[in-house]
Amino acid sequence: LYKNYELILVDDLSEGSVMNLPSALRKKLIKKKIQNIKKLNTKKLNGIFHLAAQASVPLSLIEFCKSTSNNLTSSIKVFEFSKKYSAPVVYASSSAVYGNLPLGSDEIKKFSVLSPYAQDKLTIENYAKMSYKIFKTSSVGLRLFNVYGPGQTATSPYSAVIPIFIYRMLKNLPIIINGGFQTRDFIYIDDVVNVMKKSMNKIQ
């Protein structure tokens, strides 16, 4: 994207590192929470990719108020900028909204909210619908399943399973699987990026 567009990046770096960015983008980073930014130094936005979130389900149970406040206020701010600039939004929702629904369930009408994080994501989807209904701002929410790829940490108690497995294999440590009958869907980060770009092209 940065080869074809002028980008504005916003991240408080509470997770991740500026070193994960290409060197050409590091000076373009605004190191703040999006909800704390009053205005952007630009006259036009072609589109917004919204990935800001506290994305750990276990942490959302431990720090319920902080987690939910962060997830909702950041998203509301994004839709506010979307309204101001008439900019479409592609945002990350989550497979967590499905909970333990059986296979074949109606994905539009049925949900099984089992955590504050899942409720946050479902609420954000409803804000997106409201924003379109009232302000005519277009958006696409992607209910992502277990994204993995380079740059993930494996040493946090809230780390995803694939980086943990890789870390333990590199250290010649056993891979611990409780039960062994669980099934999960995973998607590689490059595939997510491609879908997000295609989604943005569709609604611009």
Task: Annotate each language-model stretch with its function.
Residues 1-147, 190, 196-200:
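N-terminal Rossmann-like NAD(P)+-binding domain of SDR-like oxidoreductases, especially those catalyzing
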Residues 66, 78, 166, 183-184:
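Residue-level signal for alpha-helical context at structural boundaries
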Residues 19, 54, 153, 171-174:
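Charged, solvent-exposed alpha-helical segments that act as regulatory interaction surfaces
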Residues 147, 163-175, 186-204:
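Alpha-helical substrate-binding/gating segment
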Residues 114, 145-159, 174, 179-190:
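Glycine-rich "substrate-gating" loop/helix at the edge of Rossmann-like oxidoreductase active sites
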